[in-house]
Curated annotation (Swiss-Prot):
It comes from Plasmopara viticola. Belongs to the RxLR effector family. Has the canonical translocation RxLR motif, but lacks the canonical EER motif, which characterizes most oomycete effectors identified so far. One of its GO terms (cellular component) is host cell cytoplasm. Residues 1-31 form the signal peptide. This is Secreted RxLR effector protein 57. A motif (RxLR) lies at residues 58-61. Keywords: Host cytoplasm, Host nucleus, Secreted, Signal, Virulence. It comes from the Eukaryota. Secreted effector that completely suppresses the host cell death induced by cell death-inducing proteins. It is found in: Secreted; Host nucleus; Host cytoplasm.
Length: 128
């Protein structure tokens, strides 16, 4: 993929980005776009405001399919913003435990990533 085209894709809106990622056939390019998406501060703030919706599920599913979680391309903190809504009035106790585990500095990054992978798979399983 040419740099110019990649730049256009990366400068698209969040929903356009998700659509572009879904349409891309090259898994390396898709992983790269997902990794860039979750690292951008602006888009991470957008992700933090998402509710448990089709959009959130699509982001998680894409990340899981592309191995972005296992490879560490998506940080634990970025994934936490997707999995755990800020405005949740009654957070699931399992998700609350994930938050406390994330803030525990004695836990390794590998452990935290595995915890979030499990959490993401759980959400994808229980949500329609």
């Amino acid at each position: 993929m040419h740099r110019k085209r990649l730049r256009v894709v990366l400068s698209a809106t969040l929903l356009d980005l998700i659509t572009c990622v879904q349409l891309m056939l090259d898994p390396l390019v898709r992983s790269h776009v997902i990794a860039r998406l979750v690292r951008w501060r602006h888009h991470r703030l957008l992700l933090a405001e998402l509710v448990l919706s089709e959009t959130r599920v699509r982001i998680l599913r894409l990340a899981l399919e592309q191995g972005a979680l296992e490879s560490g391309a998506m940080s634990s903190r970025a994934l936490a913003r997707i999995v755990i809504p800020r405005s949740s009035s009654r957070p699931n106790w399992k998700l609350s435990r994930v938050v406390s585990e994330l803030s525990d500095n004695s836990k390794t990054n590998v452990y935290k990533n595995q915890l979030f992978i499990h959490c993401a798979r759980y959400l994808l399983h229980v949500l329609p």
